[in-house]
Amino acid sequence: MNYQQQLANSAAIRAEIQRFESVHPNIYSIYELLERVEEPVLQNQIREHVIAIEDAFVNSQEWTLSRSVPELKVGIVGNLASGKSALVHRYLTGTYVQEESPEGGRFKKEIVVDGQSYLLLIRDEGGPPEAQFAMWVDAVIFVFSLEDEISFQTVYHYYSRMANYRNTSEIPLVLVGTQDAISSTNPRVIDDVRARKLSNDLKRCTYYETCATYGLNVERVFQDVAQKIVATRKKQQLSIGPCKSLPNSPSHSSVCSAQVSAVHISQTSNGGGSLSDYSSSVPSTPSTSQKELRIDVPPTANTPTPVRKQSKRRSNLFTSRKGSDPDKEKKGLESRADSIGSGRAIPIKQGMLLKRSGKSLNKEWKKKYVTLCDNGVLTYHPSLHDYMQNVHGKEIDLLRTTVKVPGKRPPRATSACAPISSPKTNGLAKDMSSLHISPNSGNVTSASGSQMASGISLVSFNSRPDGMHQRSYSVSSADQWSDATVIANSAISSDTGLGDSVCSSPSISSSTSPKLDPPPSPHANRKKHRRKKSTSNFKADGLSGTAEEQEENLEFIIVSLTGQTWHFEATTYEERDAWVQAIESQILASLQSCESSKNKSRLTSQSEAMALQSIRNMRGNSHCVDCDTQNPNWASLNLGALMCIECSGIHRNLGTHLSRVRSLDLDDWPMELIKVMSSIGNELANSVWEEGSQGRTKPSLDSTREEKERWIRAKYEQKLFLAPLPCTEFSLGQQLLRATAEEDLRTVILLLAHGSRDEVNETCGEGDGRTALHLACRKGNVVLAQLLIWYGVDVMARDAHGNTALAYARQASSQECIDVLLQYGCPDERFVLMATPNLSRKSNSRNNSSGRAPSVI
């Protein structure tokens, strides 16, 4: 075992010890809090539940299950629209539940293969597969919905992520297309040919179509994957030989038993009425009482025998707290946690690099053991031993840094980076239907010899003569998928010629460019004691003549916002590119995970991800509103539309009076903004702004920026394609009042696009005085209220009785409208709302021959 593997194992062990030992202090804290519950009956009921949880934890499978009981570990991945949660629930309970679980779940069930019982561990992953997941599974089920294109494309992304962490030829794969969501209004979009092509691309894995509503092929999927795992193990045993045969039971994974997060109440089985044979929160053990599971061990010097107080029954595996000092015990726990290396982030990349000293006069280069962790921190230590002991180390927070390679100009940022947190949309910017995976030696090629904009190559591992495996990598961050780049030892590649931008960080870049890279800077001319060749052939102006000289520059620099620099050097340029790419990905991930300091009412991360996903699910939002680029990640708030990053830059130049641009990934999203975006969408927006564009060619992904800018300015600034007004009999302001009262969103958008500030502020009449904002707030419609404010309605306006729109929002009990009005400076005056006459809701346009304005409520 090499030292990196040993280090990773050691870190994983320490993390598991920390997790395990963190449980009983929390349980003790619950017992102490229970003493504050004054009602005895409630106190005892809660205590019994805590005791049951405690006993279930201490009697988990790693402590009780015999080693003769084998385990099968199955991972299930797919985005929120894939239907994977319904698939698992149907298999476990025999019933159908439509809701998808964003956080996934952990489940256990007995399964019989070839007459032998196995403990089936099912891990429903809430997001893309990570390294821990990839190393844990025995097999993976990829799930997509037959009516959802994005969930289909997500499988390519998740497969490539798996290939980054593990050789996919080692584990069985199964592809599942779910039919649950198909209906007359929601037709199938993934035909059988495309689905089977995907199964061939995924190393010719088995493909099933399932329906959780009535159980089609559900049992068959899990039975097949279990049989594949058993067959793979037998094959491995035969290949190893009798002297090194594998044990009957694989090592028990503490991760599975420890991270049981989802609790599902078992329902009646198919025809028996008894409890189902699975449990998602405790291991499947024989039906034995808790007392029978306990073994009284005589006290010894090494094994303390704690005694529970009657009023505070606690697990006999935990030490007694009777008479102990809570502060001392807490300190003891902390010190013990420190001794096992608690709190250390697990590195995602590590190795020896040269670092240039920033203090010494000669700026000498010294060896450092460098680690990059998934928390966005890069650390370096004088040696591996110092890292293991966690001494003499220094950290670099990558959040406010960028990484540079001397002598190379940063390429144009590539487009189609998608949100991390949104499980359904993964930012797949290209059509991946042309993907091909070659069966020989894990290499991957596209459909043709040349790079294609629509082709993406996936790979698992590249074999090397020394028996080691070289892992592939891409420019995508933890939950993102961007246009991959062609790197010497990369396995994920696509054409970068169409790339325009990146979601959040300009430092994310491709490694190739259609143009020659500029020569290295004079910094590369310094002699390094570890350099194999000298790069001294620079011209007087610091320019180099050949590309080979540029590649000999093995240095990369991390630069902070404060101007501080850290110089590192690798041994090969492949290693340098790998470090640069990994650091760029962590910079992007850090930017996307940082919380805004604005004091806004934000949703939880999970609910916000679901809310943003609802925006992406709006009709037309899978493509840019102006150029049809796939998976746009930028929004125009007042237009209610999504766009690509290049078009968003053009929209910014229009001014906020025409387009208010915001990033889906990087900016705050209060509820009122989410409601606006999830109420309009690109299809509705273009039905207003592009209705008159017949015969005109709309820009595409391949169009130049100038072509896109001409289209956007003609569309929004000159309003050349805007739909005509629906009615000319009444003034625009009166039509706006009517449309607001009827909550006709499309008409309101159209009238606001045509209207001026004066027309938007027109009132119902002298005896009424209400503006469209008053009417929107009376309805409690925060979407219309927000749109009216953006288009210039006066939030200070009062009706004939002196009431502002805030009074109407309070009457409607619409906290969202109240918050928006206060945010824009509406006076917080709590007057008693004076009634205004309720006029007929029906339009008088047909019978109104005198030209009176249409009445509103």
Swiss-Prot record:
Any one biological process term the GO annotation gives: protein transport
Domain annotation GLD: ranges: 67-241
InterPro entries: Ankyrin_rpt (IPR002110), Ankyrin_rpt-contain_sf (IPR036770), Arf-GAP_GTPase_ANK_PH (IPR051282), ARFGAP/RecO (IPR037278), ArfGAP_dom (IPR001164), ArfGAP_dom_sf (IPR038508), P-loop_NTPase (IPR027417), PH-like_dom_sf (IPR011993)
Residues found modified as Phosphothreonine: T836
Domain spans labelled PH: 346-588
Region (Small GTPase-like): 66-276
Pfam families named among the record's database cross-references: Ank_2, ArfGap, Ras
A Gene Ontology cellular-component term: cytosol
PANTHER family for this protein: ARF-GAP WITH GTPASE, ANK REPEAT AND PH DOMAIN-CONTAINING PROTEIN 1, CENTAURIN-GAMMA-1A
Name listed for the protein in its UniProt record: Arf-GAP with GTPase, ANK repeat and PH domain-containing protein 1
Organism: Mus musculus
Record lineage: Eukaryota, Metazoa, Chordata, Craniata, Vertebrata
